[in-house]
Amino acid sequence: VSTQLGHLLGLFVAGPVDTRDFFQAVEIIHGQGGLAVLAHPFEHSRDGARLAPAVPLLDGVEVWNSRADRKLRDANRLAASFAQVCRLPCFGGSDAHCPQEVGNGYTCVEADALTAQAVKTALLSGCARAQGTRSRAWYAARSQLIKRRKTGAKPLSYVKWAAFAAKCCAQDIFWRGD
């Protein structure tokens, strides 16, 4: 769910979450017995203070996102620190925009049984760890191109995209760190 405080994941929900308001979205998720997890909270900004109103309502934080560090290189590290300071469970996710990215980020859970309730309990008690590998930068560039085409972007936007795509290709070729 896209909200004014960022993206929010609703886990274990049975129905749609039809709102852009963070607080209403959390209420709907919790009303369905779900978990509200803040997704890639530092992808665009280092400002953790903006998230303070959200903390008491959250069930966890996505601390490994295979795409988040494209815009802010230490986004995942900042998310992990935030989760630790706020004492919130940690989650991992792919944020897949294409089939090749599925499974690049994930949450390993140590549950007593293979039931939704057992997994949910394990997640809330911190019996999980976020893991993954970084998505190729080219996939981020490609999804941005698709977004521009869908929204009827202006020609200058494509020039900016070309520079971003070149940067992404260079990262895929030369950057070795994860």
Regions found by a protein language model. Give the residues of each.
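Short beta-strand/loop segments at the ligand-binding rim of alpha/beta enzyme cores
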Residues: 29-37, 89
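Aromatic-lined carbohydrate-recognition surfaces of secreted/lumenal glycan-active proteins
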Residues: 37-45
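Charged catalytic cores and adjacent phosphate/nucleic-acid-binding surfaces used
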Residues: 2-16, 23, 27, 44-178
